[in-house]
């Protein structure tokens, strides 16, 4: 139950003494250009990581970096666990889950390897005390992009793809959106398509709808005002942090 107190902590921006960057189209264009170049640059990278070593790297990252911003370091004994009812996780499209009562992070065992690094880092961010889904995405992205392993970096960039595409759809004119899509590597588009089809094939719509409603209510009742849409705030957070404290943190 103690983990739930994290919902009452001061948000990241005030804690760091910075203001959120104004989300302007020109600034988003710059972000999108840099992001797309990095995404394409490591698309198709061969996997060289293993899960045990990757988990150790994630723990070390949070212990060295996130503690500077008020979060807790992670111990060697803190491991992600397997859900007891994994088919239910897949039926509702949940890739991972933070259990607040026993402070345990769980990962869906059906996760494709390409999604594993980003999702692992996201769930371990929660274990370090991060409650905002946007911020957990932010920390997961920062971990992945600083990795020396191109496949880990790709997992991070691909993990952001749905959020970048959503913002692009909202901010760009149709011809600009089409032009951006044409700059994407065919490997990226195929990986995104295969991931979407993989999870769609496991979803049970009725259960999924109930889970989404419950998640939205849970987050809103715990001071996450955006509810389930909080995940999408990661792009604004990346633009703010990169502009005000630099890409290396």
What is the predicted role of each segment?
Residues 3-66:
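Membrane-interface segments at or immediately adjacent to transmembrane helices
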Residues 8, 12, 39, 43, ...:
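A generic secondary-structure signal for well-formed alpha-helical elements
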Residues 118-137, 141-142:
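Active-site recognition of the HExxH zinc-binding catalytic motif
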Residues 187-249:
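Pan-zinc metallopeptidase signature
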């Amino acid at each position: 139950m103690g983990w739930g107190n994290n919902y009452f902590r001061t948000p990241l921006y005030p804690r760091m003494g910075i203001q959120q960057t104004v989300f302007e189209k020109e600034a988003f264009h710059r972000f999108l250009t840099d992001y797309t170049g990095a995404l394409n640059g490591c698309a198709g990278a061969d996997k060289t990581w293993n899960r045990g070593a990757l988990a150790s790297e994630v723990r070390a990252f949070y212990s060295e970096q996130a503690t500077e911003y008020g979060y807790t370091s992670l111990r060697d004994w803190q491991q992600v666990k397997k859900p007891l009812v994994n088919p239910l996780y897949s039926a509702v499209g949940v890739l991972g889950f933070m259990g607040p009562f026993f402070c345990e992070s769980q990962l869906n065992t059906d996760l494709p390897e390409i999604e594993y690094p980003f999702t692992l880092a996201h769930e371990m961010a929660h274990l370090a005390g991060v409650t905002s889904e946007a911020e957990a995405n932010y920390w997961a992205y920062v971990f992945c992009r600083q990795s020396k392993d191109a496949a880990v970096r790709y997992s991070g960039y691909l993990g952001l793809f749905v959020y970048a595409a959503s913002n692009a759809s909202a901010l760009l004119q149709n011809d600009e959106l089409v032009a951006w899509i044409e700059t994407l590597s065919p490997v990226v588009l195929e990986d995104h398509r295969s991931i979407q089809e993989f999870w769609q094939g496991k979803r049970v719509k009725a259960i999924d709808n109930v889970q989404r409603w419950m998640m939205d209510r849970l987050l809103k009742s715990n001071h996450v005002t955006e509810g389930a849409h909080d995940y999408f705030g990661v792009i604004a957070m990346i633009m703010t942090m990169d502009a005000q404290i630099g890409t290396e943190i």
